[in-house]
């Protein structure tokens, strides 16, 4: 049985992470769980920026940002759907794996 540690990350934090020099490129982000009945309407409206984040696999490791992991358990996961103007929309569950 897997144990996940959940964090709720607000859009302004997420966008700061994305635009920071090498924090976001340190992670491989995979879409894990989507509460499709809730999120589908937002996905249908479409946000190309969001889809780019979810689809792109970034494997460049960061030497400046290190996060502690407990064994091999996935660590961070909740990010928010971003609107065109980066306001908070809705949470989706992500698995984020540190690329070492």
Swiss-Prot record:
* Residue ranges that the Swiss-Prot or TrEMBL entry lists as coiled coil: none
Q: Does the keyword Nucleotidyltransferase apply?
A: no
The keyword Protein transport appears for this protein: no
- Membrane-crossing residues? 9-29, 41-61, 72-92
Ordered alphabetically, the record's keywords are:
Membrane, Transmembrane, Transmembrane helix
Q: How does it sit in the membrane?
A: Multi-pass membrane protein
Q: In which compartments does the protein localize?
A: Membrane
The Gene Ontology CC terms held by the record are: membrane
Q: What else is known?
A: Partially overlaps YOL036W.
In Swiss-Prot or TrEMBL terms, this protein is called: Putative uncharacterized protein YOL035C
Its source organism is: Saccharomyces cerevisiae (strain ATCC 204508 / S288c) (Baker's yeast)
């Amino acid at each position: 049985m897997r144990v996940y540690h959940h964090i709720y990350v607000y859009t302004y934090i997420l966008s700061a992470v994305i635009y920071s020099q090498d924090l976001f490129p340190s992670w491989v982000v995979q879409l894990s769980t989507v509460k499709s009945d809730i999120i589908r309407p937002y996905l249908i409206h479409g946000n190309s920026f969001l889809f780019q984040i979810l689809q792109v696999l970034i494997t460049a490791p960061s030497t400046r940002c290190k996060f502690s992991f407990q064994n091999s358990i996935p660590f961070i996961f909740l990010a928010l759907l971003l609107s065109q103007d980066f306001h908070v929309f809705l949470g989706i569950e992500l698995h984020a794996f540190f690329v070492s």
